[in-house]
Amino acid sequence: MKKNLGMLALIMAFWFTISFITNILGPLIPDIIHNFNLSDLAMAGFIPTSFFLAYAIMSIPAGLLIDRFGEKPVLFCGFLMPFIGTILFACMHTYPMLLASSFIIGLGMAMLQTVLNPLQRTVGGEENYAFIAELAQFMFGIASFLSPLAYTYLIRELDPATYTAGKSLILDLLADMTPQDMPWVSLYWVFTLLLLVMLIAVGVSHFPKIELKEDEKSGSKDSYLALFKQKYVWLFFLGIFCYVSTEQGTSIFMSTFLEQYHGVNPQTEGAQAVSYFWGLMT
């Protein structure tokens, strides 16, 4: 494993990026409701729904793409999709575009998670797979903890009432590219830059060929149909659905709940609560 430490570090950076973008929705929901004048929480709920619906759609095709084209092209496309999604909304700040952006980002994230799990086993070695998987989850949690704090920082620094030009070149650029009444959109420019770095990293890196186990290879159409006929497959699906719904539902609407029922400022204490939630989950 020692000779692959650089590659492992890159994979951990991939997981960090995925989580940093994926778990920011909680702090953003109150801003989305206010800026787009959404009448109820159901309208806001379509944002995470579009994101996770993309997972359901892309999971099986992602496996087929890995079998046909290999891990590097799928990894590159996995970062390219959210790059396109984030830059679209960063440039066009409408509710329909946010829905489309979330869906496109979700497609890419599904591709990334499908390819990264077998890749980290190949790079780290079969005997270290459990440790590498736990390390990846740790990086995932750290990014989830930090992203709401990054949101609060940008909101505070880009607030028209407190923003001072010339304080920072990066902040000046973000201020120029972000609507004054929607400073949270600056996060999408940060995501775009982060994803661009990941695309370059994938482009210049040489990844080992993934040797998939027999039970990891994508099967034929008949094999999928046979799986869907098994009741335990549906029970597993239901279990994952309930877990993810509980975890993501809590984090996504926590800040909104605290604002509406307890008068908590969603841009500071609300975002901090989401950060602590992910930190404790880690």
Whereabouts are the PLM-identified features?
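Extracytoplasmic
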Residues: G6-L38, L116-N117, S147, Y151, ...
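Extracytoplasmic gate region of multi-pass secondary transporters
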Residues: L25-G26, S147-R156, A226-G279
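Extracellular/periplasmic helix-loop-helix junction of adjacent transmembrane segments
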Residues: L28-A56
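Central cavity-lining transmembrane alpha-helices of secondary-active solute carriers
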Residues: F46-L64, S275-T282
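Conserved MFS/SLC helix-loop-helix module at the cytosolic interface between two early adjacent transmembrane helices
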Residues: I57-P96
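Intracellular juxtamembrane helix-capping segments at the cytosolic ends
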Residues: M111-G125
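Glycine-rich segments within core transmembrane alpha-helices of 12-TM secondary carriers
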Residues: N128-T162
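C-terminal membrane-cytosol helix-exit motif in multi-pass small-molecule transporters
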Residues: Y151, I155-P160, L173, P179, ...
